[in-house]
């Protein structure tokens, strides 16, 4: 058997494994956080690709700088409050998805055996990347207001010293929670006091339809590295993400990216930039995304509460892509329900997939992003036939 220690540490993603199952046409998937196919801006992407190949074929098809396509870096810098900085793009590294950004910054800032703190439950991809890097994980409790910063402070007071604290501050994956304004201020103060880096993984921040967004962590402390992506607001198949970081951190990540893949696809970088920078495109497209996902979220939550309200609690999302449902039967194990659910034609992700130290057996992550209303109804009907009645 060919298997390194890194492979053993990382393990296989439960969600990626489920995607093989959900490709079967008879399965209604509430598992993956995939954009709704109807929202993919194929015409705009086609225009951008054609323009890149016509206007700059050499730049689109030749090797490029590891840091990324400079116009895209400038655009990202502007979106992150650096528009007035003439060298704002120096803070930006374009990566092959934000997943690569997390992998690079972990290797750049944490040696194997170092400590990274994160919420429990946590995003599966982050768990894979961190475990593959050989770091130790400090599991911090979380609730409806995000990471429990007081619990982190207690750990720090005992002498624990994480190099990184990883958060999905806006519409966490899997819980859907948003880190409250008060906790953001407290977390930033802890970073300044103890010297750790905050990694704010932010693929969902633009998908808000209710309420005001709290102040970004990057505006509260310079010890913030923000990860972003074109996957949720444009198309995941383009595999373009980015990190916005202090220049010395960006340079360290660039050195590691050189040995990883030289640079992210020059063509897809141009496609992303030309599409997102097209006047009026992003504003209009975000309206479409928010309207679509709000309607689908409300539909799924309503169906679950109507048909399964005696068996689970279902929060109302303000944005993002996920519902973190909780089974009322405290002895239930959602992992044991997955196979019967798939056999019935519906897929979800059990809470155990997101566990750092806890298994979250009564939790289920349900995505409303991909399926239409009729499919969501069918999925709920099938779940109702699998989850035991009280």
Residue locations for each model-derived region?
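N-terminal small-domain helix-loop-helix segment of the aminotransferase-like
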Residues: 8-97, 104, 278, 347, ...
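Conserved PLP cofactor-binding pocket of PLP-dependent enzymes
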Residues: 27, 203, 342-365
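Conserved core of the PLP fold type I
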Residues: 59-194, 205-223, 293, 322
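Active-site PLP attachment segment
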Residues: 206, 219-252, 264-267
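Structural signature of PLP-dependent enzymes
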Residues: 253-258, 278-302, 330
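Conserved glycine-rich beta-strand-loop-beta hairpin in the small C-terminal domain of fold type I
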Residues: 291-301, 313-326
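Short, conserved charged micro-motifs
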Residues: 331-337, 374-378
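PLP-dependent enzyme catalytic core of the Aspartate aminotransferase-like
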Residues: 343, 358-390
